[in-house]
Amino acid sequence: MIRVDIETIVMAAGPHPSLIVLRERETSESNEAPLRALSIQTGSFEAAALSQGIDGKNPGRPITHDFTVNAVKELGVKIARVEISHMETPVFFANVIILDQNGKEHAVDARPSDALAFAVRVNAPIYVEDDIMNRAGTFSYQTDTNDEAEQQKFDEFVHTLSPDDF
């Protein structure tokens, strides 16, 4: 399993899918090699729920992901991690690994978007099966530029993109 972080969420409107981009974490072994990224399509509501969790926004009343996290805490169990476990092209599958009161792990099947929404709400690590990254991932090159103007220009360009551009 490869540890990843959520790099970005590309929100789409209407019938177009949104994208969640997961990026491989840098390790001492990956200093010279380009890191890999995995893009997962999801609906706009799911992307918005994930974004809310990342931003820590309180919608006033708990949405489904907040309710589930609250229930897990009330029951005295813990979301230990999230795993993107396998794929049946083009569908990805995930497990939420829950640690019970005795320390035993339980894998609960979940959609990747839901699993990620839980992970960001409890700060749980996210992992992707190596085979999935090899088959469906792309290379994600980091730059060492400190030129804020160049970065701002690139950010503005990225915000003009839609899934149809790909």
PLM region descriptions:
Residues 1-166:
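Divalent-cation
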